[in-house]
A protein has these predicted regions:
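Rossmann-like dinucleotide-binding domain that binds NAD(P)(H)
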Residues: 124-198, 258-261
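Conserved SAM-binding loop
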Residues: 14-15
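Short acidic low-complexity segments
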Residues: 27-41
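Rossmann-like NAD(P)-binding element
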Residues: 37-57
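NAD(P)-dinucleotide binding in Rossmann-like oxidoreductases
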Residues: 169-174, 182-246, 250-258
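Beta-strand-loop-alpha-helix segment that lines the small-molecule cofactor/substrate pocket
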Residues: 44, 55-102
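C-terminal helix-rich "cap/oligomerization" subdomain common to oxidoreductases
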Residues: 18-20, 44-49, 245-289
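Short, small-residue-biased leader/transition segments that mark boundaries at the very start
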Residues: 2-7
């Protein structure tokens, strides 16, 4: 296994974290800073950078290394043209690619999915305080699309508060307000992010006769009034299982790049329009990650 990072301090921290865990004597891990130090062929690469450098890293990687499978972190890219450029690059190099929106892997969302009548519209709402609307909406859109059984959506950004906020990640921005999502079968998703710490995390899903409430921070859901615990897996508990699935079967349950790319582009176009109106400038990129 190899771990690459341009910042030596981050590599040292990663090594420390790895060695604090239960080390597998059958594994060898390398800590690298340059793509040129990688082997010429790799079975699986996870690109877990922020959004701005991701396409450049992807291009540099595929120019030097034959990669069979890649997992990309969201938010994928900051510019709309990046998505088609990346798609062409991935197709030319015959790479299997997925995007890490891991709620699809949570057992309780799989259970909810089995309850949903896909012939009826789904009504989903998510409200919380300062949860990173720009950064994290794609997670909610992704699980909404899985549950609704839809592949395309439109979105209305009229409810965004026209004030640019600094993201907790340096060099990136955020907005508060609401985004409303609509699919062809009439399913809707309302995403609300407020600057009010008294507002409690709330996710609701209504479909047919089912009324479901999910509270991820407190670890429970209520299905038609019946409350039950849910297990929120950490990323560290998920990555190994996903990697095994990809390496053994050549596939996994994460969203493919080509599907997630479409979800990203609709959201990015909408939030970029808001960003340009608020700043009074014509940016071709919106710095969200």
């Amino acid at each position: 296994r190899g771990l690459g990072d341009v910042y030596k301090r981050q590599l040292q921290i990663a090594q420390q974290r790895y060695e604090e865990g239960e080390v597998n004597s059958n594994q060898t891990i390398y800590y690298l800073q340059l793509i040129e130090q990688l082997p010429t062929e790799l079975d699986l690469v996870v690109i877990a950078t922020s959004s701005k450098p991701r396409l450049t890293i992807l291009k540099s990687l595929l120019a030097k290394v034959k990669v069979t499978n890649i997992i990309l972190e969201k938010f994928l890219f900051t510019g709309l043209t990046d998505y088609d450029e990346a798609e062409q690059l991935l197709q030319i190099n015959h790479v299997n690619v997925w995007v890490n929106c891991p709620r699809r892997l949570f057992d309780f969302y799989v259970e909810i999915d089995s309850m949903i009548d896909k012939q009826k519209p789904l009504v989903m709402e998510y409200t919380d305080s300062n949860w990173g609307l720009c950064c994290n909406s794609i997670h909610m859109i992704d699980i909404f699309m899985m549950l609704s059984g839809e592949k395309t959506y439109t979105a209305c950004f009229d409810g965004i508060i026209p004030q640019v906020k600094d993201s907790k990640r340096n060099g990136y921005i955020e907005f508060n307000g609401t985004v409303n999502v609509l699919t062809p079968n009439g399913s809707t998703l309302r995403l609300a992010c407020v600057d009010d710490d008294t507002v409690q995390h709330q996710m609701t899903i209504i479909n047919g006769s089912h009324h479901i409430i999910i509270n991820e921070p407190e670890g429970f859901m209520s299905v038609d009034g019946n409350k039950q615990p849910v297990h929120i897996k950490y990323q560290s508990q998920l990555t190994g299982a996903v990697a095994d699935e990809i390496l053994l079967n050549g596939n996994c349950k994460l969203t493919t790049y080509f599907e997630s790319s479409n979800y990203h582009k609709v959201f990015l176009k909408g939030i970029l329009d808001v960003y340009n109106k608020v700043t009074g400038e014509m940016h071709d990129r919106c710095p969200i990650t």
